A protein has these predicted regions:
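Active-site/ligand-binding neighborhood in enzyme catalytic cores
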Residues: 93-187
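Mid-domain catalytic core of redox enzymes
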Residues: 182-291, 401
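Conserved flavin/dinucleotide-binding core of flavoenzymes
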Residues: 263-399
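Dinucleotide-binding Rossmann-like beta1-alpha1 core, especially the glycine-rich loop
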Residues: 33-104, 108, 112
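Residues forming the flavin
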Residues: 153-166, 179-186, 190-194, 198, ...
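Single-pass alpha-helical membrane anchors
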Residues: 164, 397-410
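A short, Lys/Arg-enriched amphipathic alpha-helix followed by its capping loop at the start of a domain
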Residues: 2-12, 170-171
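Glycine-rich FAD pyrophosphate-binding loop
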Residues: 8-30
Length: 410
């Protein structure tokens, strides 16, 4: 939707084909009667400069959608960290690399308690554990959000999706809902393609931008981005299960989700939503055992590990379905690849890929990253303004060093 907004500002006609019945992306929720979300969210005000800018452009109030989140991971970290853990983290700027995982650079150098925290902290940041997250992503994530306050959703994701849809429709964006891209054939000798949608529409010649997450991208890239594209997407994609526990009289208070993730067998990430009645419990560490755990056993396991009273109902959030043997996922995301991201274009100049697999400055998968890559694509190919850049901790450090040097010289 970011890309559509940027292109309509310069008069480019845009049609969005959306497989869901309304707009919203991974923040989508089916209706306003009961919360049904793919995963709960954390936002960072000063770090999300492009998101705030886009919402302002669309005349959508940030405060109407989001509220301050007071819980934080630092109290639990400070309680558990030993002196050697702080020393290990101080070396991170010197050893962090894109091709080395966080586990590679920290394992064996921290106390057991400190290692456990750093193993599970990436789950809170980007839905992955330390053996998947690159040390670069961890360092840059702190750099990116270190000056920010945490926020979370005040209302259903449907509210934001509907407001963005209305803004886009006003400027002339055409939407085709309940429409999926069923087949994409690349015609290499013609530098063209044929795209077939579920409503029978066929496209060729026009610019087709695949604004998709990793799972559908795996099926759509073919060999257009080279032989390593599918491997990269497979290695960096991840999904989640979200169990929603309904407490009409008020959900129980929970400890910080980092502490619960570090102390439960399934690495659970629970959070009471803003309505105070819904406990959203995300499972990102999808082991083979969890993937083959039937719904009722999964619900019982979550209740036992959280140690909470029985809710009125337990539901599985949208995006995950049980096929009788295994959980299947219709929504996914992707972490930064250890080997680098994919370019917008492959061999075919008429088909582009724009999403979490694209090169981005925002290190963690998020709405901010999505807005950034949408703006970057529009800038590179249509001459629109570049994405905004976040004020980072490193910028402050550099500024202080410059001031220090100037004072010494004087």
């Amino acid at each position: 939707m970011t890309l559509a907004w940027e292109l309509r500002k310069i008069g480019v006609p845009v049609t969005i084909h959306e497989r869901k019945p309304s707009a919203g992306g991974s923040w989508w929720e089916p209706d306003l009667t009961k919360r049904d979300l793919h995963a709960h969210r954390i936002l960072f005000d000063r770090g999300w400069v492009n998101t705030r800018s886009l919402l302002k452009d669309m005349d959508i109030s940030w405060d109407a959608l989001f509220e301050r989140h007071t819980d934080g991971v630092f109290p639990y970290m400070f309680k558990k960290f030993k002196f050697q853990d702080y020393l290990a983290l101080l070396t991170l700027p010197f050893v962090a690399r894109r091709d080395r995982t966080l586990k590679d650079v920290l394992q064996g150098r921290m106390s057991p308690e400190g290692a456990s925290i750093m193993e599970h902290l990436p789950l809170i940041i980007d839905g992955i554990t330390w053996d998947v997250m690159s040390s670069y992503e961890m360092l840059e994530s702190f750099n990116h959000v270190g000056l920010s306050r945490q926020w979370t959703q005040r209302v259903s994701g449907k509210v934001m999706g509907d407001l963005m849809y209305e803004a886009l429709e006003k400027v002339g964006v055409e939407f085709k809902f309940n429409t999926s891209l069923d087949e994409l054939l690349y015609i290499s000798d013609e530098d063209n393609y044929v795209a077939t949608f579920s409503d029978g529409t066929k496209l060729k010649d026009e610019l087709l931008v695949l604004c998709v997450d990793h799972s559908p991208a795996i099926k759509l890239v073919g060999d257009n981005w080279g032989p390593g594209a599918k491997t990269m997407l497979n290695d960096t994609t991840y999904g989640c299960l979200n169990l929603l526990l309904d407490y009409p009289m008020g959900a129980p208070e929970m400890k910080d989700d980092l502490e619960i993730a570090a102390t439960t067998p399934w690495k659970l990430q629970p959070r009471v939503l803003s309505d105070g009645k819904t406990l959203s419990c995300v499972i990102c560490n999808l082991t083979d055992s969890i993937l083959h755990t039937p719904p009722e056993a999964l619900k019982q396991g979550v209740l036992e590990q959280l140690g909470v009273r029985a809710p009125e109902t337990i539901r599985v959030g949208w995006g995950s379905t049980w096929d009788g043997e295994r959980w299947q996922f219709h929504q996914s995301s992707g972490t930064l690849a250890l080997t680098g991201q994919l370019p917008f274009f492959g061999r075919c100049s008429r088909v582009a890929l724009c999403g979490m697999m694209s090169e981005r400055r925002t290190p963690y998968a998020s709405l901010e990253a999505a807005v950034e890559v949408g703006r970057q694509f529009a800038h590179e190919n249509f001459g629109t303004p570049t994405p905004l850049e976040t004020l980072k901790l490193s910028h402050i450090v550099i500024l202080l060093l410059i001031v220090f040097v100037v004072l010494i010289i004087k």
